[in-house]
Amino acid sequence: MANAKEIKTKIASVQNTQKITSAMEMVAASKMRKAQDRMASSRPYAENMRKVIGHVAQGSLEYKHPYLEVREAKRVGYIVVSTDRGLCGGLNVNLFKKVVADVKKQREAGAEVEFCPIGARSVQFFNSFGGQVSAHASGLGDAPSLTDLIGTVRVMLEAYNEGKLDRLYVVFNKFVNTMTQTPVIEQLLPLPKSEEDEISHHWDYLYEPDPKELLDTLLVRYVESQVYQGVVENIASEQAARMVAMKAATDNAGELISDLELVYNKARQAAITQELSEIVSGAAAV
């Protein structure tokens, strides 16, 4: 058994760690609320944009935009959104597992894949995973703007326009609630058709002044908005996961401190008992 001094040093060390994890929990809680506000403000735009684009994909247009054409999936691109930092539980691990499983299916079907990682953890993972990394972005911070992502996203869009990609997906952690964040893979290109209107009726629009000019701008903006929404959803998920992980670490530290204090008291009691025994033995010898 370690002596009382060593145990006391361990207790002090764990207490210092507990203070750090407790502070990180409070910081993550504050950042999560701000991230939730940003996510909630942009989510209606992204969802309604997806609905409108779904209706466009079902419409009968004289001008067929390349994003509306379904091609054989010979090469597939993934925009994978992760965190820049760790200490957020299994958030990134679960996301990467989902991507790897989907990539395996694509490769079994004979398709090649390339990646556009967003976030330091994603960049690090896919540089070692294997496969072409066409573009990447990291260090976006807790409040990224759309302009921070445009350059990276445009690289993948240009590859699609040139026929180098036949499918484009965005992968991120969707924020459900504080305790639940779900990794999702959403198809960006070709444009997914609206599921809710497939049975009831088809939508069509009148385009002024020119369908080509409008769609060229609208469809690019749609892809950018979906990627941006994925990023803000992932940030909210990151802060929620970090808050939960740091709370668990703080609670575990408290339990460890209690256990160490019990061991410390036993060691101290044993030392006192030994000293008393030595005193009694010495007195008896005299």
Curated annotation (Swiss-Prot):
Keywords: ATP synthesis, Cell inner membrane, Cell membrane, CF(1), Hydrogen ion transport, Ion transport, Membrane, Transport. F-type ATPases have 2 components, CF(1) - the catalytic core - and CF(0) - the membrane proton channel. CF(1) has five subunits: alpha(3), beta(3), gamma(1), delta(1), epsilon(1). CF(0) has three main subunits: a, b and c. PANTHER family: ATP SYNTHASE GAMMA CHAIN (PTHR11693), ATP SYNTHASE SUBUNIT GAMMA, MITOCHONDRIAL (PTHR11693:SF22). The keyword Transmembrane does not apply. GO terms for biological process: proton motive force-driven plasma membrane ATP synthesis. NCBIfam families: ATPsyn_F1gamma, PRK05621.1-1. Pfam families: ATP-synt. The keyword Ligase does not apply. GO terms for cellular component: plasma membrane; proton-transporting ATP synthase complex. It comes from the Bacteria. It is found in: Cell inner membrane. Belongs to the ATPase gamma chain family. Produces ATP from ADP in the presence of a proton gradient across the membrane. The gamma chain is believed to be important in regulating ATPase activity and the flow of protons through the CF(0) complex. This is ATP synthase gamma chain. GO terms for molecular function: ATP binding; proton-transporting ATP synthase activity, rotational mechanism.
